[in-house]
């Protein structure tokens, strides 16, 4: 779980747009965040397997 201070800090609008970075909406993780869903890879996988993300299915080949 991410530190509360860093999560709150990321919610503020920065002075410069380039300082902005994406965080997971669920857990606040700063790395491996999918822009389209706003989720990190771990939360994305959990929600996709539960069927909470429409149009996403597990690949098999």
UniProtKB/Swiss-Prot annotation:
The keyword Methyltransferase does not apply. One of its GO terms (cellular component) is small ribosomal subunit. One of its GO terms (molecular function) is zinc ion binding. Pfam families: Ribosomal_S14. GO terms for biological process: translation. Binds 1 zinc ion per subunit. It comes from the Bacteria. Zn(2+) binds at residues 24, 27, 40, 43. Coiled coil: none annotated. SUPFAM superfamilies: Glucocorticoid receptor-like (DNA-binding domain). Keywords: Metal-binding, Ribonucleoprotein, Ribosomal protein, RNA-binding, rRNA-binding, Zinc. Binds 16S rRNA, required for the assembly of 30S particles and may also be responsible for determining the conformation of the 16S rRNA at the A site. Belongs to the universal ribosomal protein uS14 family. Zinc-binding uS14 subfamily. Part of the 30S ribosomal subunit. Contacts proteins S3 and S10. This is Small ribosomal subunit protein uS14. It comes from Petrotoga mobilis (strain DSM 10674 / SJ95). The lineage of its organism: Bacteria, Thermotogati, Thermotogota, Thermotogae, Petrotogales.
């Amino acid at each position: 779980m991410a530190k509360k201070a860093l999560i709150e800090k990321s919610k503020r609008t920065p002075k410069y747009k380039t300082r902005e970075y994406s965080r997971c909406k669920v857990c606040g993780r700063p790395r491996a965040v999918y822009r389209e869903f706003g989720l990190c890879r771990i939360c994305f996988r959990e929600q996709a397997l539960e069927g909470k993300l429409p149009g996403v299915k597990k690949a098999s080949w």
